[in-house]
Amino acid sequence: MIFKPMQHKAAGLPHNPLKAIVAPRPIGWIASRGSDNSINLAPYSFFNALSDDPAMVMFSVQTDSPDHHKDSLRNVEETGEFVVNIVGEAQFDSMNISSENFPYGDNEFIHAGLEMVDSDSISVPRVGKVPAALECVHYETMHLPRNAQGG
């Protein structure tokens, strides 16, 4: 199969196949704290490790418009810290709850009934009982060009 971004419907595919082609994809459950001390927790399917020396991870924030910032990105850019929580099977339902579009400042930990655990080296809490949590310091935000067809 030859894949051309945003031309999937012309090929008879109901959805863009990129997410299915690059698999399995881990879910990065990103916890962040805003400069107003509000806590945010949201899952990101475009998350991965970039390097082990230096240790670096990334998550991709996709928005409807260039002017709209997701709470996670806003918080990470304001405070420079975030936690990547690795989602286990026991957290699937809570992760789905945290993916809802809550107003800025609403704490998804509370909505999803999750335990907040203090991190060791940063001010952002992590999710209790996840298989792993990566305490991170923001290095750089890259703004990628948007596809003219909306992707």
Language model features with spans:
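Active-site-proximal mixed secondary-structure blocks
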Residues: 1-40, 48-151
